[in-house]
Protein backbone atom coordinates (compact mmCIF):
# COMPACT_ATOMS: atom_id res chain seq x y z
CA UNK A 1 0.00 0.00 0.00
CA UNK A 2 1.44 3.34 -1.08
CA UNK A 3 1.92 6.27 1.26
CA UNK A 4 -1.05 8.66 1.28
CA UNK A 5 -0.22 11.93 -0.46
CA UNK A 6 -3.65 13.58 -0.61
CA UNK A 7 -4.95 16.48 1.50
CA UNK A 8 -3.94 15.85 5.12
CA UNK A 9 -6.85 17.91 6.48
CA UNK A 10 -9.37 15.63 4.76
CA UNK A 11 -7.68 12.51 6.10
CA UNK A 12 -7.48 14.08 9.56
CA UNK A 13 -11.23 14.61 9.61
CA UNK A 14 -11.90 11.08 8.36
CA UNK A 15 -9.73 9.55 11.10
CA UNK A 16 -10.78 12.02 13.79
CA UNK A 17 -7.23 13.12 14.68
CA UNK A 18 -4.95 15.99 13.71
CA UNK A 19 -2.20 14.78 11.39
CA UNK A 20 -0.63 18.24 11.18
CA UNK A 21 -0.11 18.47 14.92
CA UNK A 22 -1.92 21.82 15.06
CA UNK A 23 -5.49 20.60 15.50
CA UNK A 24 -6.76 23.25 13.08
CA UNK A 25 -8.31 20.65 10.75
CA UNK A 26 -10.80 19.63 13.43
CA UNK A 27 -11.62 23.04 14.93
CA UNK A 28 -14.38 24.05 12.53
CA UNK A 29 -15.45 20.64 11.25
CA UNK A 30 -14.73 17.86 13.77
CA UNK A 31 -16.44 15.24 11.63
CA UNK A 32 -15.66 13.15 8.55
CA UNK A 33 -15.74 14.84 5.12
CA UNK A 34 -18.79 14.22 2.96
CA UNK A 35 -22.24 15.61 2.12
CA UNK A 36 -24.01 14.35 5.24
CA UNK A 37 -22.34 16.56 7.82
CA UNK A 38 -21.64 15.82 11.48
CA UNK A 39 -24.25 13.07 11.85
CA UNK A 40 -22.74 10.68 9.31
CA UNK A 41 -20.28 8.66 11.46
CA UNK A 42 -21.33 5.02 11.57
CA UNK A 43 -20.87 2.67 14.49
CA UNK A 44 -17.86 0.52 13.66
CA UNK A 45 -17.53 -3.22 14.12
CA UNK A 46 -14.72 -4.65 16.24
CA UNK A 47 -12.68 -5.18 13.07
CA UNK A 48 -13.53 -1.65 11.91
CA UNK A 49 -12.28 -0.17 15.18
CA UNK A 50 -9.03 -2.13 14.94
CA UNK A 51 -8.51 -1.11 11.32
CA UNK A 52 -9.25 2.54 12.09
CA UNK A 53 -6.74 2.57 14.96
CA UNK A 54 -4.08 1.06 12.70
CA UNK A 55 -4.78 3.65 10.01
CA UNK A 56 -4.67 6.48 12.56
CA UNK A 57 -1.22 5.49 13.76
CA UNK A 58 0.12 4.69 10.29
CA UNK A 59 -0.95 8.04 8.86
CA UNK A 60 0.16 9.90 11.98
CA UNK A 61 3.74 8.77 11.31
CA UNK A 62 3.35 8.91 7.52
CA UNK A 63 4.61 5.41 6.75
CA UNK A 64 3.36 2.93 4.17
CA UNK A 65 1.82 -0.41 5.09
CA UNK A 66 4.95 -2.45 4.34
CA UNK A 67 7.16 -0.29 6.58
CA UNK A 68 4.48 -0.25 9.26
CA UNK A 69 4.13 -4.05 9.32
CA UNK A 70 7.89 -4.61 9.22
CA UNK A 71 8.36 -2.42 12.29
CA UNK A 72 5.41 -4.11 14.01
CA UNK A 73 7.03 -7.52 13.48
CA UNK A 74 10.38 -6.20 14.73
CA UNK A 75 8.68 -4.91 17.90
CA UNK A 76 7.24 -8.37 18.51
CA UNK A 77 10.73 -9.82 18.87
CA UNK A 78 11.68 -7.43 21.67
CA UNK A 79 11.18 -8.02 25.39
CA UNK A 80 8.18 -6.23 26.88
CA UNK A 81 4.75 -5.31 25.58
CA UNK A 82 4.42 -5.67 21.82
CA UNK A 83 2.24 -2.57 21.34
CA UNK A 84 4.38 -0.30 23.50
CA UNK A 85 7.57 -1.47 21.80
CA UNK A 86 5.96 -0.74 18.44
CA UNK A 87 5.06 2.82 19.46
CA UNK A 88 8.60 3.40 20.73
CA UNK A 89 10.17 2.10 17.49
CA UNK A 90 7.92 4.35 15.40
CA UNK A 91 8.93 7.33 17.51
CA UNK A 92 12.61 6.44 17.06
CA UNK A 93 12.47 6.85 13.27
CA UNK A 94 14.83 9.57 12.06
CA UNK A 95 12.11 11.58 10.31
CA UNK A 96 10.07 11.61 13.52
CA UNK A 97 13.03 12.63 15.68
CA UNK A 98 13.79 15.50 13.28
CA UNK A 99 10.15 16.58 13.63
CA UNK A 100 10.13 16.25 17.44
CA UNK A 101 13.33 18.33 17.68
CA UNK A 102 11.50 21.14 15.91
CA UNK A 103 13.63 21.15 12.75
CA UNK A 104 10.44 20.69 10.70
CA UNK A 105 6.83 21.71 11.32
CA UNK A 106 5.36 18.42 10.14
CA UNK A 107 6.57 14.85 9.80
CA UNK A 108 6.16 15.17 6.04
CA UNK A 109 8.56 18.13 6.00
CA UNK A 110 10.97 16.21 8.23
CA UNK A 111 10.90 13.25 5.84
CA UNK A 112 11.76 15.56 2.94
CA UNK A 113 14.69 17.06 4.86
CA UNK A 114 16.07 13.58 5.49
CA UNK A 115 15.44 12.38 1.92
CA UNK A 116 17.24 15.40 0.49
CA UNK A 117 20.35 14.82 2.60
CA UNK A 118 20.07 17.82 4.93
CA UNK A 119 20.29 15.79 8.17
CA UNK A 120 23.32 14.37 9.98
CA UNK A 121 23.45 11.55 12.53
CA UNK A 122 26.61 11.63 14.64
CA UNK A 123 28.16 13.91 12.02
CA UNK A 124 27.42 11.68 9.02
CA UNK A 125 24.70 12.31 6.46
CA UNK A 126 21.78 9.88 6.65
CA UNK A 127 19.06 10.11 3.98
CA UNK A 128 16.85 7.21 5.13
CA UNK A 129 13.73 8.46 6.98
CA UNK A 130 13.11 5.01 8.51
CA UNK A 131 16.58 4.90 10.11
CA UNK A 132 16.11 4.03 13.79
CA UNK A 133 17.90 6.49 16.05
CA UNK A 134 19.58 4.98 19.11
CA UNK A 135 19.92 6.57 22.56
CA UNK A 136 23.01 8.78 22.70
CA UNK A 137 23.05 9.61 18.99
CA UNK A 138 23.22 13.24 17.88
CA UNK A 139 21.02 14.69 15.14
CA UNK A 140 22.20 17.80 13.33
CA UNK A 141 21.86 19.84 10.14
CA UNK A 142 24.45 19.96 7.36
CA UNK A 143 26.41 23.21 7.27
CA UNK A 144 25.14 23.96 3.74
CA UNK A 145 21.54 23.48 4.88
CA UNK A 146 21.54 25.62 8.02
CA UNK A 147 19.98 28.63 6.28
CA UNK A 148 17.05 26.77 4.76
CA UNK A 149 13.89 28.75 5.50
CA UNK A 150 11.93 25.59 6.31
CA UNK A 151 14.37 24.83 9.16
CA UNK A 152 14.80 28.39 10.46
CA UNK A 153 11.05 29.03 10.55
CA UNK A 154 10.36 25.71 12.28
CA UNK A 155 12.94 26.33 15.00
CA UNK A 156 11.60 29.85 15.59
CA UNK A 157 8.04 28.68 16.31
CA UNK A 158 8.85 25.46 18.18
CA UNK A 159 8.50 25.84 21.94
CA UNK A 160 8.41 22.22 23.07
CA UNK A 161 10.96 19.40 22.94
CA UNK A 162 10.14 16.07 24.64
CA UNK A 163 12.11 15.17 27.76
CA UNK A 164 13.85 12.27 26.01
CA UNK A 165 15.46 14.74 23.60
CA UNK A 166 17.76 17.72 24.07
CA UNK A 167 18.11 20.50 21.50
CA UNK A 168 20.53 23.39 20.98
CA UNK A 169 18.82 25.95 18.73
CA UNK A 170 22.09 27.81 18.08
CA UNK A 171 23.89 24.70 16.85
CA UNK A 172 20.73 23.21 15.27
CA UNK A 173 21.70 20.00 16.98
CA UNK A 174 19.88 17.62 19.28
CA UNK A 175 20.49 14.37 21.13
CA UNK A 176 18.23 11.35 21.49
CA UNK A 177 19.07 10.90 25.16
CA UNK A 178 16.88 7.87 25.87
CA UNK A 179 13.99 5.82 24.53
CA UNK A 180 10.63 7.45 25.21
CA UNK A 181 8.20 5.96 27.69
CA UNK A 182 4.71 5.02 26.53
CA UNK A 183 3.22 7.82 28.64
CA UNK A 184 5.18 10.33 26.51
CA UNK A 185 3.68 9.13 23.24
CA UNK A 186 0.32 9.67 21.45
CA UNK A 187 -2.28 9.29 24.22
CA UNK A 188 -5.05 9.19 21.59
CA UNK A 189 -3.81 5.84 20.23
CA UNK A 190 -4.91 2.47 21.64
CA UNK A 191 -2.09 0.24 20.41
CA UNK A 192 -3.76 -2.87 21.84
CA UNK A 193 -6.31 -2.62 19.01
CA UNK A 194 -3.47 -2.67 16.47
CA UNK A 195 -1.94 -5.76 18.07
CA UNK A 196 -5.38 -7.40 17.89
CA UNK A 197 -5.73 -6.39 14.23
CA UNK A 198 -2.50 -8.10 13.18
CA UNK A 199 -3.24 -11.11 15.39
CA UNK A 200 -6.43 -11.98 13.51
Curated annotation (Swiss-Prot):
Gene3D superfamilies the UniProt entry points to: Ribosomal Protein S4 Delta 41, Chain A, domain 1 (1.10.1050.10), RNA-binding S4 domain (3.10.290.10)
Domain of life: Bacteria
Annotated Pfam families: Ribosomal_S4 (PF00163), S4 (PF01479)
Keyword list, A-Z: Repressor, Ribonucleoprotein, Ribosomal protein, RNA-binding, rRNA-binding
Chain ranges of the S4 RNA-binding domain: 92-155
Protein family according to the UniProt entry: Belongs to the universal ribosomal protein uS4 family.
Region: Disordered, residue numbers: 22-42
InterPro entries found in the cross-reference section: Ribosomal_uS4 (IPR022801), Ribosomal_uS4_bac-type (IPR005709), Ribosomal_uS4_CS (IPR018079), Ribosomal_uS4_N (IPR001912), S4_RNA-bd (IPR002942), S4_RNA-bd_sf (IPR036986)
Oligomeric form and interacting partners: Part of the 30S ribosomal subunit. Contacts protein S5. The interaction surface between S4 and S5 is involved in control of translational fidelity.
GO biological process, one term: ribosomal small subunit biogenesis
GO CC annotation: small ribosomal subunit
HAMAP family: Ribosomal_uS4_B
Function: One of the primary rRNA binding proteins, it binds directly to 16S rRNA where it nucleates assembly of the body of the 30S subunit. With S5 and S12 plays an important role in translational accuracy; many suppressors of streptomycin-dependent mutants of protein S12 are found in this protein, some but not all of which decrease translational accuracy (ram, ribosomal ambiguity mutations).
This protein's name: Small ribosomal subunit protein uS4
Annotated NCBIfam families: PRK05327.1, rpsD_bact
One MF annotation (Gene Ontology) recorded for this entry: structural constituent of ribosome
Gene behind the chain: rpsD
Amino acid sequence: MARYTGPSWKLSRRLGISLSGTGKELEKRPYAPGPHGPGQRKKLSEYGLQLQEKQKLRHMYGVNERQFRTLFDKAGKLAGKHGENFMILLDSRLDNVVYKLGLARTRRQARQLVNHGHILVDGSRVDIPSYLVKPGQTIGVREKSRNLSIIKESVEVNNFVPEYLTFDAEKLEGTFTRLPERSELAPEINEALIVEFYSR
